[in-house]
Amino acid sequence: MTDHRTRFLQLALGADALRFGQFTLKSGRLSPYFFNAGRFDSGTKTAQLAQCYADAIDAAGVDFDLLFGPAYKGIPLATALACAYAGRGRDLPLAFNRKEAKDHGEGGTLIGAPLAGHKVLIVDDVITAGTAIREALGIIRAAGGVPSGIVVALDRQEIASEQDRRSAAQAVATEAGIPVIAVANLSDLLAFAAENADLVDFREPLLAYRGRYGTDTTG
């Protein structure tokens, strides 16, 4: 497992963003783990997370020249990532959307750098159903930008339904024709659990969950 994946999972565990136990998801599935990016709730934690994002993006080799953060969790993530890249000598323009359009001040739903003519990388925490990402794709295209990729912290690698054996990330990637990059995924989490004595008891529930809900790419 590459360093940024291990580093991210260690950070998530330390921040209590990654928890093990029994959690009921919005889908109704009972999951042995839960990820909440909102627990990266300080400057240091967010800066460390952004470095993991940057390493994953660089390793994937995606071509982009602007960062876009969908409201709401994508906004601080994209901002932190822009700061991480500035520290690496790359000053990237940044934009995000608001949920409700303003009819005063600067107006509209978009804030930040103009999207027109840019290759846009969408930054978010996870892809659950893909609704927010699909909305972001529409916003970017309507503003004249070209979506070039999507990056998220964790890919659960689980099927959308018994009828659709793809994950939400796979479905979005296929529909949009762009890569979805994850800092880490369920396969990485299984490897991480196997290598950590404190987590070894959670490996069997994780394997059982993958066996029931995992996509074909998690084997």
UniProtKB/Swiss-Prot annotation:
Superkingdom of the organism of origin: Bacteria
Cofactor: Mg(2+)
GO cellular component: cytoplasm
Record-linked Pfam families: Pribosyltran
Catalysed conversion reaction: orotidine 5'-phosphate + diphosphate = orotate + 5-phospho-alpha-D-ribose 1-diphosphate
Residues that coordinate or bind orotate: F34, F35, T128, R156
Broad EC category: transferase
Enzyme Commission number(s): 2.4.2.10
Biological role: Catalyzes the transfer of a ribosyl phosphate group from 5-phosphoribose 1-diphosphate to orotate, leading to the formation of orotidine monophosphate (OMP).
Protein name according to UniProt: Orotate phosphoribosyltransferase
Organism: Xanthomonas oryzae pv. oryzae (strain MAFF 311018)
